[in-house]
């Protein structure tokens, strides 16, 4: 399938089937407008309690939607027809904290001791921004969102520690204020930004070179606005070095059956 094709109007079931059958492996930004998108972190059960506490201590970076029992591939809370081992466009596999490979399904890697954490994603508030008349640059340019490692520390928990990863979207000052107001309503999608303006204040030395995703144009009259990001666990995994871990690939999310509006507040 043409990865550049807009999928906003494609019914969710059809999009999920494309992903499940490896016919769509691109970024899910702008896809399935209005539906909650989610990051995944899959760990051996012996590491799960520490990571659960890590999520609870860091709700902006890791807004927990739900967690499975060991070996469970399905979560009724997010959708009746979701298979956590097949329904993400691309998974990243880590051994001892080091990235090993990218795969399109987990059929040969699944184990009965694996616990899956489903974490909210900022893609979930994109539709609310668009409906309010705001333009999202990476969607307009047909790109993945820009994501950066930062110097912002997470609160440590057990084996897990590390720094935030953030996503960035540029806005004029007036639109940035509106974006802050809107995204504050979505705490399960990272909520309000963690920073805006000078990227060097959070350890980003070259905003034109994201650590993950794609670079986008930032116009002279715009400021970069930074949100917590579900790639944070991947940064933490590199430091904490669990023997085995699987995550989604940055920008390539699990799309749930739940509406983003169900998780809105205010």
Swiss-Prot record:
<dbReference type="InterPro" id="IPR009906">
    <property type="entry name" value="D-Glu_cyclase"/>
</dbReference>
<dbReference type="GO" id="GO:0016829">
    <property type="term" value="F:lyase activity"/>
</dbReference>
<dbReference type="InterPro" id="IPR038021">
    <property type="entry name" value="Putative_hydro-lyase"/>
</dbReference>
<dbReference type="Pfam" id="PF07286">
    <property type="entry name" value="D-Glu_cyclase"/>
</dbReference>
<dbReference type="InterPro" id="IPR016938">
    <property type="entry name" value="UPF0317"/>
</dbReference>
<comment type="similarity">
    <text>Belongs to the D-glutamate cyclase family.</text>
</comment>
<keyword id="KW-0456">Lyase</keyword>
<protein>
    <recommendedName>
        <fullName>Putative hydro-lyase VF_1377</fullName>
        <ecNumber>4.2.1.-</ecNumber>
    </recommendedName>
</protein>
């Amino acid at each position: 399938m043409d990865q550049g094709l807009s999928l906003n109007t494609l019914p969710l079931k059809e999009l999920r089937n494309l992903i499940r059958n490896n016919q769509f492996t691109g970024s899910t930004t702008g896809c399935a407008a209005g539906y909650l998108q989610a990051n995944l972190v899959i760990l051996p059960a012996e590491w799960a309690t520490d990571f659960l506490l890590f999520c609870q201590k860091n709700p902006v970076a890791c807004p927990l939607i739900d967690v499975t029992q060991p070996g469970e591939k399905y979560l009724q809370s997010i959708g009746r027809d979701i298979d956590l081992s097949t329904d993400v466009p691309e998974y990243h596999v880590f051994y001892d904290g080091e990235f090993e490979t990218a795969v399109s399904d987990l059929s040969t890697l699944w184990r009965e001791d694996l616990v899956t954490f489903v974490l909210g994603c900022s893609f979930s508030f994109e539709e609310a921004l668009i409906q309010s008349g705001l333009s999202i640059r990476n969607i307009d340019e047909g790109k993945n969102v820009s994501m950066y490692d930062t110097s912002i520390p997470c609160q440590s928990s057990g084996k897990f520690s590390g720094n935030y990863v953030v996503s960035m979207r540029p806005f004029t000052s007036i639109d940035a204020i509106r974006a802050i107001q809107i995204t504050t309503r979505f705490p399960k999608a990272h909520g309000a930004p963690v920073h805006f303006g000078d990227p060097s204040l959070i350890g980003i030395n070259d905003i034109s070179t994201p650590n993950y995703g794609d670079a986008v144009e930032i116009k002279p009259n715009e400021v970069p606005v930074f949100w917590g990001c579900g790639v944070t666990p991947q940064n933490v995994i590199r430091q904490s070095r669990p023997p085995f871990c699987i995550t989604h690939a940055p920008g390539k999310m699990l799309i749930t059956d739940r509406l983003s509006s169900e998780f809105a507040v205010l």
